[in-house]
């Protein structure tokens, strides 16, 4: 499984516009093949900081998403409405039940 975290600091005047855009985009992205989660969170201490969390089944489905029109729209919205976006990716492996008890 691949997890992508995108942290953005939204321009204060664009915060409501960003929330509307990301709500619509997140629900569309969630319908893409291989997407296990697409959600966003607002920082408790900074109302203009948001984190978008995506979980993908594998690298192949993530790569397909990164080539999609939806991703291009997402990047465009982030570039117009935010400053200095930060994208982190981590690969994860689901542990067997026995391994989690150790």
Enumerate the predicted regions with their spans.
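Short acidic, gly/pro-rich beta-turn/loop elements at beta-sheet edges
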Residues: 16-18, 48-50, 62, 97-99
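N-terminal first-folded block
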Residues: 2-31, 35
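Glycine-rich beta-strand-turn "strand-cap" elements at beta-sheet edges
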Residues: 2, 40-48, 76-102
């Amino acid at each position: 499984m691949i997890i992508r975290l995108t942290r953005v600091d939204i321009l204060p005047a664009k915060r409501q516009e960003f929330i509307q855009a990301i709500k619509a985009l997140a629900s569309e992205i969630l319908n893409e093949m291989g997407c296990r989660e697409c959600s966003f969170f607002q920082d408790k201490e900074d109302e203009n900081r948001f984190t978008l969390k995506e979980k993908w089944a594998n690298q192949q489905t993530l790569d397909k998403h990164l080539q999609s029109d939806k991703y291009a729209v997402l990047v465009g919205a982030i570039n117009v409405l935010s400053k200095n976006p930060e994208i982190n990716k981590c690969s994860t492996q689901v542990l067997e039940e026995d391994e989690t008890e150790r």
